[in-house]
């Protein structure tokens, strides 16, 4: 009976110790799961810092993109402003060149070389034909690199070979003018001859009583 009692005691003690060890293991496992599920306050504090640090490069990248876009826009605006300034400078230079005596802008100017007198205040004839009063009467002037003279009949410059001596009208216009004068003189003489003939015929028929025949 003593051996049976001892065996029972040993079994009960071993079973209780095993149960205690199992309970300890279960408690340890439960404690481990709870620690994994519920983070500590220090870990909670670290999380926003990690998130902020992870987002910092992204924000920096966005700022870099905006700064690069701003730099591109600034470069484009500066290039456009420089081109507008250059265009304004070219326009100013063109206006300055047009104001010179040899320029094509402004009012009419004398076409004689080394003259270029402004004819804005000159007479209508001089403005129309682009010649000053002095060079319109000069016997020899230089126009377009040629020795020429202003024709009073054509109102333009001709080379000296088209004039006779010191005449101020070209040979062709003088010939036409002389031809018209001769024709006009011939017509006048013919009319006078006809009129005298009519008068003579009338006087010859006065004694006969017949009316004179007249050509009208």
From Swiss-Prot:
<comment type="function">
    <text>Trans-acting factor that binds specifically to the consensus nucleotide sequence 5'-TNCGTACAA-3'. May be involved in panicle development.</text>
</comment>
<feature type="binding site">
    <location>
        <position position="158"/>
    </location>
    <ligand>
        <name>Zn(2+) 2</name>
    </ligand>
</feature>
<feature type="compositionally biased region" description="Basic and acidic residues">
    <location>
        <begin position="189"/>
        <end position="203"/>
    </location>
</feature>
<keyword id="KW-0238">DNA-binding</keyword>
<dbReference type="GO" id="GO:0008270">
    <property type="term" value="F:zinc ion binding"/>
</dbReference>
<keyword id="KW-0805">Transcription regulation</keyword>
<keyword id="KW-0862">Zinc</keyword>
<dbReference type="Pfam" id="PF03110">
    <property type="entry name" value="SBP"/>
</dbReference>
<keyword id="KW-0804">Transcription</keyword>
<dbReference type="GO" id="GO:0003677">
    <property type="term" value="F:DNA binding"/>
</dbReference>
<dbReference type="InterPro" id="IPR036893">
    <property type="entry name" value="SBP_sf"/>
</dbReference>
<feature type="binding site">
    <location>
        <position position="132"/>
    </location>
    <ligand>
        <name>Zn(2+) 1</name>
    </ligand>
</feature>
<feature type="compositionally biased region" description="Polar residues">
    <location>
        <begin position="205"/>
        <end position="216"/>
    </location>
</feature>
<keyword id="KW-0539">Nucleus</keyword>
<feature type="short sequence motif" description="Bipartite nuclear localization signal">
    <location>
        <begin position="167"/>
        <end position="183"/>
    </location>
</feature>
<feature type="binding site">
    <location>
        <position position="154"/>
    </location>
    <ligand>
        <name>Zn(2+) 2</name>
    </ligand>
</feature>
<feature type="binding site">
    <location>
        <position position="170"/>
    </location>
    <ligand>
        <name>Zn(2+) 2</name>
    </ligand>
</feature>
<protein>
    <recommendedName>
        <fullName>Squamosa promoter-binding-like protein 13</fullName>
    </recommendedName>
</protein>
<feature type="binding site">
    <location>
        <position position="110"/>
    </location>
    <ligand>
        <name>Zn(2+) 1</name>
    </ligand>
</feature>
<feature type="region of interest" description="Disordered">
    <location>
        <begin position="175"/>
        <end position="216"/>
    </location>
</feature>
<feature type="binding site">
    <location>
        <position position="151"/>
    </location>
    <ligand>
        <name>Zn(2+) 2</name>
    </ligand>
</feature>
<dbReference type="InterPro" id="IPR044817">
    <property type="entry name" value="SBP-like"/>
</dbReference>
<feature type="binding site">
    <location>
        <position position="135"/>
    </location>
    <ligand>
        <name>Zn(2+) 1</name>
    </ligand>
</feature>
<feature type="zinc finger region" description="SBP-type">
    <location>
        <begin position="107"/>
        <end position="184"/>
    </location>
</feature>
<feature type="region of interest" description="Disordered">
    <location>
        <begin position="32"/>
        <end position="110"/>
    </location>
</feature>
<feature type="compositionally biased region" description="Gly residues">
    <location>
        <begin position="94"/>
        <end position="108"/>
    </location>
</feature>
<dbReference type="InterPro" id="IPR004333">
    <property type="entry name" value="SBP_dom"/>
</dbReference>
<keyword id="KW-0863">Zinc-finger</keyword>
<keyword id="KW-0479">Metal-binding</keyword>
<feature type="compositionally biased region" description="Low complexity">
    <location>
        <begin position="67"/>
        <end position="91"/>
    </location>
</feature>
<feature type="binding site">
    <location>
        <position position="115"/>
    </location>
    <ligand>
        <name>Zn(2+) 1</name>
    </ligand>
</feature>
<dbReference type="GO" id="GO:0005634">
    <property type="term" value="C:nucleus"/>
</dbReference>
């Amino acid at each position: 009976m003593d051996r049976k009692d001892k065996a029972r005691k040993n079994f009960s003690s071993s079973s209780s110790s095993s149960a205690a060890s199992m309970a300890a293991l279960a408690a340890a496992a439960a404690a481990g799961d709870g620690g994994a599920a519920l983070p500590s306050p220090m870990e909670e504090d670290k999380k926003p810092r990690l998130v902020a640090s992870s987002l910092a490069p992204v924000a920096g990248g966005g700022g870099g993109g905006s700064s690069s876009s701003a730099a591109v826009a600034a470069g484009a605006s500066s290039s456009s402003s420089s081109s507008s300034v250059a265009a304004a400078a070219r326009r100013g230079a063109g206006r300055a060149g047009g104001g010179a005596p040899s320029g094509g802008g402004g009012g009419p100017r004398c076409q004689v070389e080394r003259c270029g007198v402004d004819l804005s205040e000159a007479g209508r004839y001089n403005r129309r034909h682009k010649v000053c009063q002095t060079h319109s009467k000069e016997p020899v002037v230089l126009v377009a690199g040629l020795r020429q003279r202003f024709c009073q009949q054509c109102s333009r410059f001709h080379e000296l070979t088209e004039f006779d001596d010191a005449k101020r009208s070209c040979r062709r216009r003088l010939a036409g003018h002389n031809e018209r004068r001769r024709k006009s003189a011939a017509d006048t003489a013919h009319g006078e001859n006809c009129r005298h003939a009519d008068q003579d015929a009338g006087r010859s028929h006065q004694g006969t009583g017949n009316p004179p025949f007249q050509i009208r």
